[in-house]
């Protein structure tokens, strides 16, 4: 068959000696367009790379061959069989769904399928069970390597992730709850972010949405009620108007959410007396949010896109935090005191405004991507701290806090194809201003006024090239970051910082039979915050105060990782070396040794190892996903002449189950486990186990969904 294809190409191309434009559309067997399919043009007979493209949301692509050559097209997309065919113009290419057999069990490509991309893994969501799971939060919770909820997520082995939607940074965590899972095309989990991302970003989650079909008006309404130990409410209405290349949208979202805080804390201080404080925490927080969004996207033509979005967010009522702490204090095993503490905070939020402007374009072989953000807002908080001691009586402490924040950010990236590769260059600028005033008239020395001005100018470049032995990528980022701190309107030279640093990254990806492998190296940084540098005292209780350490150095992090994807299996191994690791540290208060000081310190080094594996098969209506992994660190400390080894590994596992039933019913049963173990300078001394269950039914061709969750 290959000989016939090549002969046809020779016959067709032999008559042409000028530049050609190869166009077409990629569809599935149901005649639906396949967006984001990869189309690569090769010359024959040596299969030299000529050009490549990604299909748009209508499945269309366009390629240019600048010389007279014998040409071959390779068309591929996750979940479909790859096709090779002669390169002609205005052709319709149909891809068949991929089906593999594992031990006599047929596994179809309707399950979210993993695919290695530069720096991470891409997960297909459209046309899978995840597309009907609920919200963006629900989708991310069921993707391997990701943990978290409510817009705040971590990537396994890396830490906190920065979330993007269509390459726009998400600055409001509630935005993921507003995103319908049916609107998500795919999710990119970038565990090794390259030079185009901020050097402080440990991981990236990039959500790509699908363009809604059709023209005219569309509406979407959602109302959710959750009950248990507390009641939560979410109401949302969205509307769109689409006409040709114009897309106008608006969204109104209200939430009233409660969260419970419970736990046991033991604090032991061994000085001239052995002090032991056993505490029980019980309380909760309630927050309410009203968020409005309006925006417009405009497709000028197939090569130029522009968009503008405005968000405003406020809290109609004050958000509250009400925590009770009951403590028993022992001195050398003898009861010393009992107390009950109550911490009550009421926060009023001033309206938060955010504006985003973007442009994406293609000028021949040059692609342009520009994003700009402006953000401003603030809060006012009133606090009350009540201490009721059996031995020392009762006292009440009052505090106030006033915070103003603003941000201006812009990023420009240019990409140009050179030979078989693509060269990207760009620049990013961020300007952040924060004013923080804290007053506690009942405790002298606990009042402060701090102004923080942070600027960061970055230049970056990346080059990616496809070769016969695999894909290579190399990048370099330079950052000039300036942190100016004013305390009580005076410049704080001991805390202000100016960093000029280089951050390289590199990766190599290849495919051996059906196994995809990627080896990556990245260099990142963790810079100390003002709170970690400040010498101001923050009151906790009679036995605990918090302060910073002005001599902290930035943590330089070196990561080496190996990622593997084979059919429905995904695995990774990561080694991390942190120099000058910033860790939480507990010291003694100089004037009163029984009082602990919670602060930060640098460790000379902190090496870690993380490994995980996930498998996601399909057995008829049952679609399970099993993940497990291990964290291990090597840390020996000496404090006050005592040697401590903190190297006990911790394990985690999750088992998510989706049952896609007839009648548009769906059942989800999810379980997660985390073991005891050391985490930096802390020890998690209890295993945790969590189970979630939900059942949902869709009506009116999936335009209405009713869901019951426990």
Locations of regions flagged by a protein language model:
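Outer membrane beta-barrel strand-and-loop segments of large Gram-negative receptors
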Residues: 407-411, 456-458, 553, 559, ...
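N-terminal periplasmic accessory domains that precede
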Residues: 90-96, 136-139, 173-174, 189, ...
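Face-selective signature of the C-terminal outer-membrane beta-barrel domain
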Residues: 291-315, 339-488, 511-516, 568-573, ...
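Surface-exposed extracellular loop regions of Gram-negative outer-membrane beta-barrel proteins
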Residues: 208-223, 262, 289-294, 320-324, ...
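Short, acidic Ser/Thr/Gly-rich low-complexity loop/linker segments typical of extracellular
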Residues: 45-60
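Short, acidic, small-residue-rich periplasmic hinge/interaction motif at the N-terminus
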Residues: 40-42, 74-80, 90-129, 148-150, ...
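Short acidic/polar hinge/loop motifs at secondary-structure boundaries
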Residues: 62, 142, 168-194
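Outer-membrane beta-barrel signature, preferentially recognizing the C-terminal barrel domain
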Residues: 451-454, 494-497, 525-579, 597-610
């Amino acid at each position: 068959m290959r000989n016939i294809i090549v002969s046809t190409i020779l016959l067709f191309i032999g008559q042409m000696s000028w530049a050609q434009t190869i166009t077409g559309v990629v569809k599935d067997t149901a005649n639906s367009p396949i967006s984001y399919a990869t189309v690569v043009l090769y010359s024959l007979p040596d299969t030299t790379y000529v050009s490549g493209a990604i299909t748009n949301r209508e499945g269309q692509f366009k390629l240019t061959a600048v010389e007279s050559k014998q040409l071959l097209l390779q068309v591929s997309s996750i979940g479909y069989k790859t096709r090779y065919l002669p390169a002609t113009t205005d052709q319709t290419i149909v891809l068949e769904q991929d089906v593999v057999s594992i031990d006599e069990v047929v596994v179809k490509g309707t399950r979210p399928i993993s695919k290695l991309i530069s720096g991470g893994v891409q997960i297909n969501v459209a046309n899978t069970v995840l597309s009907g799971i609920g919200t963006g939060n629900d989708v991310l919770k069921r993707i391997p390597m990701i943990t978290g909820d409510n817009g705040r997520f971590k990537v396994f082995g890396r830490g906190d992730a920065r979330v993007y939607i269509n390459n726009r940074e998400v600055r409001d965590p509630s935005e993921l709850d507003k995103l319908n899972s049916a609107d998500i095309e795919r999710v990119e989990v970038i565990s090794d972010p390259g030079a185009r991302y901020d050097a402080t970003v440990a991981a990236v989650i990039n959500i790509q949405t699908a363009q809604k079909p059709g023209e005219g008006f569309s509406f979407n309404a959602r109302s959710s009620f959750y009950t248990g130990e507390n009641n939560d409410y979410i109401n949302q209405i969205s509307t769109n108007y689409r006409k040709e290349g114009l897309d106008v949208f608006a969204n109104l979202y209200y939430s009233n959410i409660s969260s419970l805080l419970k736990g046991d804390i033991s604090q032991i201080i061994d000085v001239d007396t052995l002090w032991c404080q056993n505490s029980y925490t019980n309380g909760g927080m309630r927050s309410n949010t009203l968020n409005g969004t309006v925006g417009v996207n405009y497709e000028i033509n197939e090569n130029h896109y522009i968009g503008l979005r405005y968000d405003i967010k406020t809290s109609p009522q004050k958000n509250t935090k009400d925590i009770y702490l009951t403590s028993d204090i022992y001195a050398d095993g003898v009861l010393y005191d009992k107390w009950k503490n109550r911490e009550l905070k009421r926060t009023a939020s001033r309206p938060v405004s955010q504006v985003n402007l973007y442009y994406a374009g293609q000028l021949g072989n040059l692609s342009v991507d520009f994003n700009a953000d402006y953000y401003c807002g603030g809060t006012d908080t009133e606090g009350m701290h009540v201490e009721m001691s059996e031995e020392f009586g009762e006292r009440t402490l009052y505090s106030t806090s006033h915070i103003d924040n603003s941000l201006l950010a812009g990023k420009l990236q240019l990409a140009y194809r050179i030979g078989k590769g693509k060269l990207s260059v760009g620049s990013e600028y961020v300007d952040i201003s924060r004013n923080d005033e804290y007053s506690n008239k009942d405790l002298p020395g606990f009042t402060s006024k701090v102004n923080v001005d942070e600027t960061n100018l970055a230049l970056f470049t990346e080059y990616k090239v496809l070769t016969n032995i695999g894909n290579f990528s190399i990048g370099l980022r330079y950052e000039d970051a300036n942190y100016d701190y004013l305390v009580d309107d005076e410049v704080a030279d001991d805390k202000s910082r100016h960093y000029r640093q280089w951050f390289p990254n590199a990766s190599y990806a290849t495919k051996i039979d059906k196994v995809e492998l990627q080896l990556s190296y990245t260099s990142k940084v963790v810079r100390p915050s003002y709170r970690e540098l400040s010498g101001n005292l923050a009151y906790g209780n009679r036995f605990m105060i918090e302060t910073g350490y002005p001599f902290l150095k930035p943590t330089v992090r070196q990561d080496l990782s190996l990622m593997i994807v084979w059919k429905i299996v995904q695995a990774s191994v990561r080694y991390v070396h942190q120099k000058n690791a910033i860790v939480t540290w507990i010291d003694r208060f100089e004037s009163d040794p029984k009082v602990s000081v919670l602060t930060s310190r640098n460790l000379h080094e902190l090496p870690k190892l993380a490994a995980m594996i996930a498998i996601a098969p399909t057995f008829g209506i049952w679609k399970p996903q099993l993940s497990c992994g291990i964290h291990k660190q090597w840390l020996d400390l000496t404090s006050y002449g005592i040697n401590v080894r903190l190297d006990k590994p911790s394990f985690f596992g999750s088992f998510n189950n989706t049952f896609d039933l007839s009648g548009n019913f769906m059942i989800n049963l999810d379980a997660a486990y985390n073991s005891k173990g050391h985490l930096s300078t802390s020890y998690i001394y209890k295993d945790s186990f969590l189970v979630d269950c939900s059942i949902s039914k869709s009506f009116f061709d999936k335009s209405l969904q009713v869901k019951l969750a426990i």
